[in-house]
Amino acid sequence: MEQLLDQFLSGVLSEWKAFILQEAKQTYFQELLAKLKNVEQELTPKASQVFRPFSFFAPNNTKLIIYGQDPYPNPQHACGLSFASNAPKLPQSLKRMILRLQQEYPELAGQNHWTKQLLEGWAQQGILLLNGVFTTNAFQTNAHRNWGWEQFNCHLLDFLLSQKLYVLLVFLGKQTENFVLKKIGGASQFASLSYPHPSPLTGRKFFDHPDALFKQINQWLKHHNHTPIDWTNGQVQYQF
């Protein structure tokens, strides 16, 4: 199990690593690792990418968390960051997120050259791109639900609370929202926004949601004296 944990921690920054190593001592996490070690199918994402969200910035630079549900079941798509993919053909959920971005910023319509590794650039700006469940079996959704990742996510929020941070939680889909909001209760250090999941399975709900997604995030950040997110990573000029 130690070997598997070492793979998970590949590239993780020191302050996040210290938190994860403390979690790894707990019974729930030991049981999670044991289950993962005994899985006969291929894991997605690969082990060295499971904790990739924690490789871009220190905890005290966390601005917001964008939550998905669980990783893409296709190993070619999953890369450790929720919704992100380095595959040549973008997954439908990521395509629809880009379309929503262009819907809110019409000047970006038709701009496709910046989509490669787009969400990695968001992560570099202080966004934790997390799934409620960090792993699954290849080509199987929700295979590791209720294995312990939910508890890890809740303890992560406790850790952020201990850092005296005021963090925006953005939920794309109800599965993660349900257990996270139950955990944080009325904690004043967290604000939240809720949207439908961008999967095609939700139909037009993601596009028809009346509140802006990306613009509302930046309005919140500016209100709390944070630099707004450049959703195009500096590759396209537009107004926040």
Curated annotation (Swiss-Prot):
GO terms for cellular component: cytoplasm. The active site is at residue 70. GO terms for biological process: base-excision repair, AP site formation via deaminated base removal. The keyword DNA repair applies. Its EC number is 3.2.2.27. Keywords: Cytoplasm, DNA damage, DNA repair, Hydrolase. It catalyses: Hydrolyzes single-stranded DNA or mismatched double-stranded DNA and polynucleotides, releasing free uracil. It comes from the Bacteria. One of its GO terms (molecular function) is uracil DNA N-glycosylase activity. The keyword Chaperone does not apply. InterPro entries: UDG_fam1 (IPR002043), Ura-DNA_Glyclase_AS (IPR018085), Uracil-DNA_glycosylase-like (IPR005122), Uracil-DNA_glycosylase-like_sf (IPR036895). It is found in: Cytoplasm. Belongs to the uracil-DNA glycosylase (UDG) superfamily. UNG family. NCBIfam families: PRK05254.1-5, ung. PANTHER family: URACIL-DNA GLYCOSYLASE (PTHR11264:SF0). Excises uracil residues from the DNA which can arise as a result of misincorporation of dUMP residues by DNA polymerase or due to deamination of cytosine. This is Uracil-DNA glycosylase. It comes from Mycoplasma pneumoniae (strain ATCC 29342 / M129 / Subtype 1). The gene is ung.
